[in-house]
Amino acid sequence: MDMMGPLPDSKGFNTILVVVDRFTKKSFFLPTHSTVTSKGIATLYQDRIFVEHGIPEKVISDQGSQFISKFMKELFEVLKIKGNPSTAYHPQTDGQTERVNQEVKEFLTMFVNDRQDDWSKWLALAQFCHNDWEHSATKHSPFFLNYGYHPRKGIEPKREYKVEAVKDFTE
């Protein structure tokens, strides 16, 4: 779990909460604000992640005040979650999330407008694309590992071809 930002204002947001499932590598990119409180993080988590995955056994986060507050410690204790903030000035502890942050930046760089104030509208698509890529560690996409099938994207090639040359070319 990591906060990415501050970014240029986009629909009232200036930060992205990035959450990565360490088993399936499924990632969530949630627009928020740099002043979000730990209660706000907990609410985002409840509304967008808990409803799909339940309560995690362990959370690795950076040293942000939102993640190491008394509230978060109490929340983790009540829910029996092992909190594991990364070592200060040692982001490699949560290297997987740091890598995902880089991918989000690369994706947004390709799609945002020149004023960079529309990045929040691209987050859902960035999340979908990221979760549809095959991960080198699992040899499957996070989407497939979570749902057991590959998503339809509306641009799938036909599986049966009537023209023999096309059939030969696709095989």
Predicted regions and their residues:
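Domain-scale segment recognizer with a strong primary affinity
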Residues: 26, 38, 42, 46, ...
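Residues embedded in well-ordered secondary-structure elements
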Residues: 6-8, 48, 119
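An active-site-proximal beta-strand-loop segment
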Residues: 1-28
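Phosphate/ATP-binding catalytic cores across multiple sugar-kinase/actin-like superfamilies
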Residues: 52
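Residues immediately flanking
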Residues: 1-3, 22, 32-34, 47, ...
